[in-house]
Amino acid sequence: MIRTMMNAKIHRARVTESNLNYVGSITIDADILDAVDILPNEKVAIVNNNNGARFETYVIKGERGSGKICLNGAASRLVEVDDVVIIMTYAQLNETEIADHAPKVAVMNEKNEIVEMIHEKENTVVL
């Protein structure tokens, strides 16, 4: 059986920009992407902690060290600058792969700096 499991999470990032007139996507600082192993063009699920919106888009690599989290195109209607978001990817794994799977979680501060890295196993709680 194949199951869809969380693979990476950027936890409590702050939206730094919103660009309605761009084609689409979310732009994320390349350092953050590297830390959680998210690739450009990879599909992401996004949760806006401020208004409860949930949506999907794809990733564009942003300037390294910028802290940039920019929602582009139609998705920009679902956020405001300074909103807190959670950005996640998922992987499809078989039962054997699940046993060793440990998602990478980057916990962010208000400046979009990584303050903690967690290699999450089941029943891990991040506040």
From Swiss-Prot:
One of the record's GO cellular component terms: cytosol
Named cofactor requirement(s): pyruvate
Residues where substrate binds: T57, G73, A74, A75
Post-translational changes noted in the entry: Is synthesized initially as an inactive proenzyme, which is activated by self-cleavage at a specific serine bond to produce a beta-subunit with a hydroxyl group at its C-terminus and an alpha-subunit with a pyruvoyl group at its N-terminus.
GO biological process: alanine biosynthetic process; pantothenate biosynthetic process
Entry's EC annotation: 4.1.1.11
Active site positions: S25, Y58
Pathway: Cofactor biosynthesis; (R)-pantothenate biosynthesis; beta-alanine from L-aspartate: step 1/1
Major subcellular location class: cytoplasm
Reactions catalysed: L-aspartate + H(+) = beta-alanine + CO2
An annotated Gene Ontology molecular function: aspartate 1-decarboxylase activity
SUPFAM superfamilies for this protein: ADC-like
Domain of life of the source: Bacteria
Subcellular location(s) of the protein: Cytoplasm
Alphabetized InterPro entries for the sequence: Asp_de-COase-like_dom_sf, Asp_decarbox
Sorted UniProt keywords: Autocatalytic cleavage, Cytoplasm, Decarboxylase, Lyase, Pantothenate biosynthesis, Pyruvate, Schiff base, Zymogen
Disulphide bridges: none
Sequence positions bearing Pyruvic acid (Ser): S25
Gene3D superfamilies documented for this protein: 2.40.40.20
Cofactor mode of binding and number, as noted: Binds 1 pyruvoyl group covalently per subunit.
Family: Belongs to the PanD family.
PANTHER family: ASPARTATE 1-DECARBOXYLASE (PTHR21012:SF0)
Assembly information from the UniProt record: Heterooctamer of four alpha and four beta subunits.
Its biological purpose: Catalyzes the pyruvoyl-dependent decarboxylation of aspartate to produce beta-alanine.
Protein name from the UniProt record: Aspartate 1-decarboxylase
Source organism per UniProt: Staphylococcus carnosus (strain TM300)
